[in-house]
Design a protein with these regions (language model features):
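A structural signal for multi-pass alpha-helical bundles of membrane permease subunits
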Residues: 1-274
Length: 274
């Protein structure tokens, strides 16, 4: 498909994929908006949207909390932070293939490390990746592990941009660490948090590699089938290029809408004052 597109004058809005029923090597036929009607009236689409939103809702808050903790540790001067600064970025530079295989082993119900630790406390761990209830939370856990160093580094740069004089003045006024964090750190860090929120939202909708390795074929009962995996399967497994392209445009529209909403709402909570 990509070779075919590269040999055409394709502007992304032509009938080649957007309004075509194209199967790769056969003649294409104009079908209008039938691809979109088929998608929007199918049960699979709403399951895919639901799974994707479940990941987003679980992933983004947890990722922000963990990344903030990482950033605060990196920005501190406690003993041993030098070792942490070396180790925290290892998941980021580890390929998703290797990382997903590691997590597949860690989450194994027979010999996985997590269930073995739970067994020490008399808790019977679930079959993480074989359960429709726990498969998506397991994917979220692995994704946070992979991304916390990347977003933690961004937040650390934001922390280092805050003038130390604010903290000194607050300390003189008797403000404790918690009040300094809520009244100084968080408000002045909102521009960085806003950027991280947009990037992480787009990143979460592009969920693919860890899904394909940890829970192939959509996971148990299709519980981890997400948008990008559906696009891949429609295009390169079923050779329904028109349907795959329609899914891609729907994904683009969703991301564009969510980004516009975030840009519109930023004035209500993002503080750009120095």
């Amino acid at each position: 498909m990509q070779i075919f597109v590269s040999l055409t004058s394709w502007d992304g809005l032509s009938e080649l994929t957007l309004f075509s029923d194209f199967s790769g090597f056969m003649d294409r036929f104009y079908v209008g908006i039938e691809n979109y009607k088929e998608i929007l009236t199918s049960k699979e689409f709403y399951q895919v949207i639901g799974n994707t939103l479940e990941f987003v809702i679980l992933y983004i808050p947890l990722m922000l909390i963990v990344s903030m903790i990482v950033a605060l540790i990196l920005n501190s001067h406690v003993k041993g932070v030098g070792i942490f600064r070396v180790l925290y970025y290892i998941p980021v530079i580890t390929s998703w293939v290797a990382g997903a295989l590691i997590w597949k082993w860690v989450l194994s119900p027979e010999y996985g490390a997590i269930n073995n630790i739970l067994a020490l406390f008399g808790i019977e761990g679930p079959s993480w990746l074989q359960s429709s209830k726990w498969a998506m939370p397991a994917i979220v856990l692995a994704s946070v592990w992979k991304d916390m160093g990347y977003f933690g580094l961004m937040l650390m740069s934001g922390l280092q941009g805050i003038n130390q004089e604010y903290y000194d003045a607050a300390a003189i006024d008797g403000a404790g660490k918690i009040k300094q964090f809520t009244r100084i750190t968080l408000p002045l860090l909102t521009p960085t948090l806003f950027f991280v929120l947009i990037i992480s939202l787009i990143n979460s909708f592009q969920l693919f590699t860890q899904i394909m390795i940890m829970t192939p074929d959509g996971g148990p009962l299709g519980s981890t089938m997400v948008m990008v995996e559906r696009i891949y399967k429609c295009g390169f497994r079923y050779y329904e290029m028109g349907t795959a392209a329609a899914y891609s445009w729907i994904l683009f529209a969703i991301l564009l809408l969510l980004t516009m909403v975030q840009m519109k709402l930023q004035n209500k909570w993002v503080n750009y004052d120095d």
